[in-house]
A protein has these predicted regions:
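N-terminal secretory signal peptides that target proteins for export/translocation
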Residues: 1-12
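Positively charged, low-complexity intrinsically disordered regions
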Residues: 7, 17, 34-37
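Polar/charged alpha-helical tracts
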Residues: 12-13, 136
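Bacterial N-terminal signal peptides
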Residues: 14-27
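Beta-propeller-forming repeat regions
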Residues: 29-335
């Protein structure tokens, strides 16, 4: 493991996000069907009674299940149908469910509940990210913004140019490259915050010696700032915390918001495994400066997700004025 992610074991105060790792739920609406195994006592083709232990019921109407899309769920929280409730779009970039799915919120702001998924695009894109700026949702991927995404997904894209060193150019292997808009320095424009990981030190999970000792290095996850100067974007390099570049255990997926309610933007990062790291802004609104990272926790302890490859996205999901975290997981579920 990356020492940077396990150096801090002090509990961070519970912040005003609903970041508990609780699964969201979907109510199915398909007709009920039954199947049954062969039973020699039945004779002929008689259907078994409902109490028969051999019955296997499926497609039960009204059944509540975990919201999910299959492999590598990437959530995009947005009021997709314009009814005032945040819904969920979830991108699944791989087989067998590849595509973009719409989950309509049929609950309430405080108690969201979702209808069964509707596939709205056969294209399921990896490293796609929703961010909110100027009170509007935007969808970005590496080097691009997708205008009118919620009317016609992927139909249009606009290249995002920047000056300076090419991001990730020196990395041989990178799996996570997430871009989001944020007003980094409080000047009213949209800067771009980028999270990139590199697997160059780690390699793959076959680097144990005969004694079970790890022989390579950790995953690395860095955060970069592309500042909007009014004339274009400029790469300002890696974002630092406590005087050193932020480096989480892969897949940083940076989330920028005023999480502690003190008027300046803080930073929460994900990682390739199952935790979140909280970086408090100890600077100002116009000149952010971050304290050393601490595991995100509340009164119950450190917040952990069910699996790994987590994708946190910041959104005021329940409309109470406080930023929440919507987190995708490796198996496609969303917390």
């Amino acid at each position: 493991m990356n020492p940077a992610t396990h150096l801090y074991k002090t509990s961070v105060l519970a912040i005003r996000t609903a970041a508990l790792a609780a699964a969201l739920f979907v109510t199915t609406s398909a007709p009920a069907r039954t199947a049954h195994t062969a039973n020699p006592k039945e004779g002929g083709g008689n259907a078994p009674a409902q109490s028969d232990p051999d019955i296997l019921r499926y497609n039960n109407p009204g059944l509540t299940v975990d919201l999910g899309v299959g492999l590598w769920g990437i959530p995009l929280p947005v009021d997709y149908d314009g009814d005032g409730l945040k819904d969920l779009l979830v991108s699944c970039p791989d087989r067998p469910y590849k595509g973009l799915y719409f989950f309509k919120n049929i609950g309430t702001p405080r108690h969201p509940r979702f209808a069964a998924a509707e596939r709205i695009s056969e294209k399921g894109m990896n490293n796609i990210r929703l961010s909110e700026a100027d009170g509007k949702p935007y969808v970005l991927s590496k080097n691009f913004e997708y205008p009118d995404f919620f009317k016609a997904p992927y139909a249009k894209k606009r290249r995002l140019h920047y000056e300076g060193e090419e991001l990730g150019a020196t990395y041989n292997k990178s799996r996570s490259n997430m871009w989001s808009y944020a007003d980094w320095d409080g000047d009213g424009d949209k800067d771009i915050v980028v999270g990139i990981d590199t697997w160059d030190d780690y390699g793959w999970d076959n680097a144990f010696d005969s004694l079970g000792r790890w022989t390579r290095g950790p995953l690395h996850g860095y955060v970069y700032l592309l500042e909007n100067t009014g004339r274009g974007y400029v790469n300002r390099g890696k974002v630092e915390a406590a005087g050193a570049p932020i480096d989480v255990y892969g897949a940083p997926n940076p989330c920028i918001a005023d999480f502690d309610g003190d008027g300046d933007p803080d930073l929460i990062c994900g990682e390739f495994v199952d935790g979140l790291t909280w970086f408090e802004n100890v600077g100002t609104r116009t000149e952010p400066r971050f304290a050393a990272g601490r595991p995100l926790a509340n009164k119950h302890g450190e917040i952990r997700l069910h699996l790994e490859m987590i994708v946190p996205v910041v959104s005021d999901f329940d409309g109470d004025g406080h930023p929440d975290l919507i987190v995708g997981d490796e198996d496609g579920r969303v917390a």
